[in-house]
């Protein structure tokens, strides 16, 4: 018989599977292009004629190119081979206008060898900005001495305080170029809209050809590579890299660039957009496809775990066999981790689930301590419920475990905080405080899970653990291991993902060691409920 709860879960899983199948179909439509089947209305590739080409890169402060005397040639590749990969670093002169928060443009021409680009009717070109505007990243200093080793901080101190919050010109030190090299014959009646805007057609006799498709990979421009342009800067390095690209990958890359641009138009910051760029640029397409499925299932398991966890705690009235200290610690550590990720401006893919988890942990503390809120006018009054004899027995085991842990934990946390204050630079005292807390959580947080393990050991049972929610969270633990290598996140948060694997294995061992026993508790704070004694039968 289907219950309302199981029907809702089945509906969510069903919608999720439909979404995954639909997304796979859409992705297939992006990377696959139907070739021209007949002779009429076909558009042939100009590269199939094997013309001798030349690549030229110019810089100018003007957004539109008027005459050749307004540009500076920074790179000239004669006898350019579209199949040969290369990378070259050149020094670019920075005009005074650009040093004063102006913009510098790069014009990239692909034209016939031996002919100037503006004299070649069969040339193709693209334009890219070499500068962008961003608020400078706050400099980290030694909080005790106030020392900072960078010249950027010295110049920043000379500026008025309100000027530090204003966007300034930053240099993009990388320019990544691609040419689509597939000898693909397009159907003129069904040109893909994404590629069409990059195509330039010419008529050669009775045949229509499309010129080489030149593409700038904007996803390779990362925030971490940007350099502040100072007024004293006269030259800056620019790395120009080239590689061929297939039609399927080109179409996929165009869609990804458009998606990132759309997110920025909807209010996503440059930092959040940069995290998405990192996923695309730093991984190959096969790992990227795996990432999509991993992310989709991570969201599904997050939802199911939150739903199961909330449902279990909503019905909970007893804390027998459950470590209250572990619940309080999980709440504290989850909130600290959320504040830390917020301070580090971590990707929203990591930040939002952490925020939801922190809210749930706060609610679980209210249930664990049996807190009720009564209002006397505008003043809230907090009342705590009473504990049964069995709950007091659990608290005894809990306090015993915490006593031994405190001898080890507190000196380690205090020592780590003092060491980081003396040797590591931070943006502010708040940043140091949050980092000290979160490093304690990440490095020694697993110790706070020991009281629950100790309670399980003393009571010789884990049967009351909500294994459904626990299983969902365990799946996400292994998924987090994959994300630890893909999504940009603080190193300490990355290491904590692998620490959770150890905790999961310990609980599996306890489940095997203490088979079915309905008088035990779980790692997430769930425990069995005390069953009221039934009255004896009259007979």
UniProtKB/Swiss-Prot annotation:
Pfam families: CLPTM1 (PF05602). The chain crosses the membrane at residues 11-31, 286-306, 326-342, 404-424, 430-450. Residues 32-285, 343-403, 451-539 are extracellular. One of its GO terms (molecular function) is phospholipid scramblase activity. It is a multi-pass membrane protein. One of its GO terms (biological process) is apoptotic process. InterPro entries: CLPTM1. Keywords: Apoptosis, Endoplasmic reticulum, Glycoprotein, Lipid transport, Membrane, Transmembrane, Transmembrane helix, Transport. It is found in: Endoplasmic reticulum membrane. It catalyses: a 6-(alpha-D-glucosaminyl)-1-(1,2-diacyl-sn-glycero-3-phospho)-1D-myo-inositol(in) = a 6-(alpha-D-glucosaminyl)-1-(1,2-diacyl-sn-glycero-3-phospho)-1D-myo-inositol(out); 6-(alpha-D-glucosaminyl)-(1-octadecanoyl,2-(9Z)-octadecenoyl-sn-glycero-3-phospho)-1D-myo-inositol(in) = 6-(alpha-D-glucosaminyl)-(1-octadecanoyl,2-(9Z)-octadecenoyl-sn-glycero-3-phospho)-1D-myo-inositol(out); a 1,2-diacyl-sn-glycero-3-phospho-(1D-myo-inositol)(in) = a 1,2-diacyl-sn-glycero-3-phospho-(1D-myo-inositol)(out); a 1,2-diacyl-sn-glycero-3-phosphocholine(in) = a 1,2-diacyl-sn-glycero-3-phosphocholine(out). GO terms for cellular component: endoplasmic reticulum membrane. Glycans are attached at residues 91, 101. It comes from the Eukaryota. Residues 1-10, 307-325, 425-429 are cytoplasmic. The keyword Signal does not apply. Scramblase that mediates the translocation of glucosaminylphosphatidylinositol (alpha-D-GlcN-(1-6)-(1,2-diacyl-sn-glycero-3-phospho)-1D-myo-inositol, GlcN-PI) across the endoplasmic reticulum (ER) membrane, from the cytosolic leaflet to the luminal leaflet of the ER membrane, where it participates in the biosynthesis of glycosylphosphatidylinositol (GPI). GPI is a lipid glycoconjugate involved in post-translational modification of proteins. Belongs to the CLPTM1 family. This is Lipid scramblase CLPTM1L. It comes from Mus musculus (Mouse).
């Amino acid at each position: 018989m289907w219950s309302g709860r199981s029907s809702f879960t089945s509906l969510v899983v069903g919608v999720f599977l439909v979404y995954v199948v639909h997304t796979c179909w859409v992705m297939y439509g992006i990377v696959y292009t139907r070739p021209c089947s007949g002779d009429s209305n076909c558009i042939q590739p100009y590269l199939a004629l094997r013309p001798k080409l030349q690549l030229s890169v110019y810089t100018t402060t003007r957004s539109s190119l008027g005459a050749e005397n307004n540009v500076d040639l920074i790179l000239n590749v004669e006898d350019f081979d579209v199949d040969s990969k290369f990378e070259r670093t050149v020094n670019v002169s920075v005009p005074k206008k650009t040093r004063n928060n102006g913009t510098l443009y790069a014009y990239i021409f692909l034209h016939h060898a031996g002919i100037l680009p503006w004299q070649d009717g069969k040339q193709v070109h693209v334009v890219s900005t070499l500068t962008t505007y961003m608020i400078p990243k706050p400099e980290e200093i030694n909080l005790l001495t106030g020392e900072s080793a960078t010249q950027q901080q010295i110049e920043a101190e000379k500026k008025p305080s309100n000027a530090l919050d204003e966007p300034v010109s930053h240099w993009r030190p990388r320019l990544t170029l691609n040419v689509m090299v597939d000898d693909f014959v397009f159907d003129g009646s069904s040109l893909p809209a994404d590629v069409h805007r990059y195509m330039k057609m010419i008529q050669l006799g009775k045949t229509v050809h499309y010129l080489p498709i030149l593409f700038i990979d904007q996803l390779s421009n990362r925030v971490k590579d940007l350099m502040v342009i100072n007024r004293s800067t006269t030259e800056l390095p620019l790395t120009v890299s080239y590689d061929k690209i297939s039609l399927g990958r080109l179409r996929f890359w165009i869609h990804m660039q458009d998606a990132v641009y759309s997110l920025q138009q909807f209010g996503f910051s440059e930092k959040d957009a940069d995290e998405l760029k990192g996923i695309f640029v730093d991984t190959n397409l096969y790992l990227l496809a795996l990432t999509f499925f991993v992310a989709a299932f991570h969201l599904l398991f997050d939802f199911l775990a939150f739903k199961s966890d909330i449902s279990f705690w909503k019905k909970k009235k007893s804390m027998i066999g459950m470590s209250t200290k572990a619940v309080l610690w999980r709440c504290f550590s989850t909130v600290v981790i959320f504040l830390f990720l917020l301070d580090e401006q971590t990707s929203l893919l990591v930040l939002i689930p952490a925020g939801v988890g922190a809210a749930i942990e706060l609610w679980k503390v209210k249930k664990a301590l049996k807190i009720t809120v009564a209002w006397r006018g505008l003043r809230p009054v907090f009342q705590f419920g009473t504990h049964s004899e069995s709950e007091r027995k659990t608290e005894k085991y809990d306090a015993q475990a915490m006593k031994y842990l405190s001898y080890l934990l507190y000196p380690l946390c205090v020592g780590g905080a003092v060491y980081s204050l003396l040797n590591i630079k931070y943006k502010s005292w708040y940043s140091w405080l949050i980092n000290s807390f979160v490093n304690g959580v990440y490095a020694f947080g697993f110790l706070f899970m020991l009281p629950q393990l100790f309670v399980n050991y003393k009571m010789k049972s884990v049967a009351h653990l909500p294994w459904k929610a626990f299983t969902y969270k365990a799946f996400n633990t292994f998924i987090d291991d994959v994300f630890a290598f893909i999504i940009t996140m603080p190193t300490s948060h990355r290491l904590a993902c692998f620490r959770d694997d150890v905790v999961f294995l310990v609980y599996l061992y306890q489940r095997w060691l203490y088979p079915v026993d309905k008088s035990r508790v779980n790692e997430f704070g769930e425990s069995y409920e005390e069953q009221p004694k039934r009255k004896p039968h009259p007979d």
